Amino acid sequence: MSLLEAVILGLVQGITEFLPISSSAHLILVQALFGMTFAGFSFEILLHLASVLAVILYYRHDLIEIIRGFFAYFTKRTPQNKAMFWFAIYLVVATGITGVAGILFEDYISETFKAPIFIALALAVTGLFLIIIERFVRHGNRTEKEMTIWDSIIVGLGQCLALIPGLSRSGTTLIVGMFAGLTKETAVRFSFLLSIPVILGSSVLAIDDLISGDLLASTGLFELAASFVVTFIASWLGIVFFLNLVRKSKLVYFAVYCFIVAILVFIFQDALGHADI
């Protein structure tokens, strides 16, 4: 893998990871269109770790508040501590549901639905639901203090759908969270914080390669460092950009983008179908 390829893949991963446009679909498409290949599954995981580091630093104050409230609730049961305690529990529940689904079905789903036509359909469905949730569904008014265990179960199940290439993890969790009656801000916050344990959990699968040095030997230290830094910066900017558009009720922009990409994938599906994706 060249330095340019490492930077491009890092840029694509970072920009698309937290936008409701499916990072996995874009990585597959970029590799197929330009003849690029990942240096193994562990390289993809390394890029995800750079993205999750951006989330951790961006939401560091929220994480500290949740952790403090969780443990403080055992000795001081204030309404705020209670809210943070249960918010942490909801994150664990949603993560557990996704983890079980990933272990049982990820290999089958990723292999079955990796064809370009499925990616196009998934992107189109994402765009459709983004329009529905933005224009035709009354936005909820429940914050994290009014969340229930059922919200975490629903969001966790929604996140399982993101195992399908073309369905965005951030998009599905945001959509189902808002359908469940959460405020847009609460749904987005829960979605971003939920990405931390999910991505860290999936990283365990590649820990042997990361520790053994196989990835370093096959890719190169400079290329790995460059892709990691680029992914981190792009992820941070992606978070800021997404939150800004969410506050301005501009999810329809992402819907239009999903439709455009879906059409392009459909048009060029024969060329993509012959690529090793």
Curated annotation (Swiss-Prot):
Subcellular location, record wording: Cell membrane
**A UniProt-annotated Pfam family:** BacA
Q: From which lineage does this chain's organism come?
A: Bacteria, Bacillati, Bacillota, Bacilli, Bacillales
Entry function: Catalyzes the dephosphorylation of undecaprenyl diphosphate (UPP). Confers resistance to bacitracin.
What the entry lists under InterPro entries is as follows: UppP (IPR003824)
Q: Known EC number(s)?
A: 3.6.1.27
Q: List the disulfide bonds.
A: none
Instruction: Quote the gene name from the UniProt entry.
Output: uppP1
Q: Which UniProt keywords apply?
A: Antibiotic resistance, Cell membrane, Cell shape, Cell wall biogenesis/degradation, Hydrolase, Membrane, Peptidoglycan synthesis, Transmembrane, Transmembrane helix
Q: Give the species this sequence originates from.
A: Shouchella clausii (strain KSM-K16) (Alkalihalobacillus clausii)
- Give yes or no: UniProt keyword Nucleotide-binding: no
Quickly give the catalysed reaction: di-trans,octa-cis-undecaprenyl diphosphate + H2O = di-trans,octa-cis-undecaprenyl phosphate + phosphate + H(+)
Main EC class of this protein?
hydrolase
Q: Give a GO molecular function annotation for the protein.
A: undecaprenyl-diphosphatase activity
Q: Name a single GO biological process.
A: regulation of cell shape
Signal sequence region: none
- Please give the start and end residues of each transmembrane region: 1-21, 39-58, 85-105, 113-133, 147-167, 191-211, 226-246, 251-271
What is the topology of this protein in the membrane according to its UniProt annotation? Multi-pass membrane protein
Which family is it part of? Belongs to the UppP family.
| Additional remarks | Bacitracin is thought to be involved in the inhibition of peptidoglycan synthesis by sequestering undecaprenyl diphosphate, thereby reducing the pool of lipid carrier available.
- Give yes or no: UniProt keyword NAD: no
Cellular component annotations (GO), alphabetically ordered: plasma membrane
Q: What is this protein called?
A: Undecaprenyl-diphosphatase 1
